[in-house]
């Protein structure tokens, strides 16, 4: 028997200024839209905006 899908899914966050990617989870129920977070980019050595990709 298959288990039901939970509300948490794994997503990728890609930097808007470089090719760096973070992996995180989000709750489908609380955040139905695409995430946009300000995170540290080690390639640029500063904080930039990361957007959720498919």
Curated annotation (Swiss-Prot):
Keywords: Ribonucleoprotein, Ribosomal protein. GO terms for cellular component: cytoplasm; ribonucleoprotein complex; ribosome. It comes from the Bacteria. Pfam families: Ribosomal_L33. GO terms for biological process: translation. GO terms for molecular function: structural constituent of ribosome. NCBIfam families: PRK00595.1 (NF001860), rpmG_bact (TIGR01023). Belongs to the bacterial ribosomal protein bL33 family. This is Large ribosomal subunit protein bL33. It comes from Roseiflexus sp. (strain RS-1). The gene is rpmG.
């Amino acid at each position: 028997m298959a288990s039901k899908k939970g509300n948490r899914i794994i997503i990728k966050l890609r930097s808007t200024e470089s090719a760096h990617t973070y992996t995180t989870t989000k709750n489908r129920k609380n955040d139905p839209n695409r995430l946009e977070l300000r995170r540290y980019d080690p390639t640029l050595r500063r904080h930039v905006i990361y957007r959720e990709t498919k």
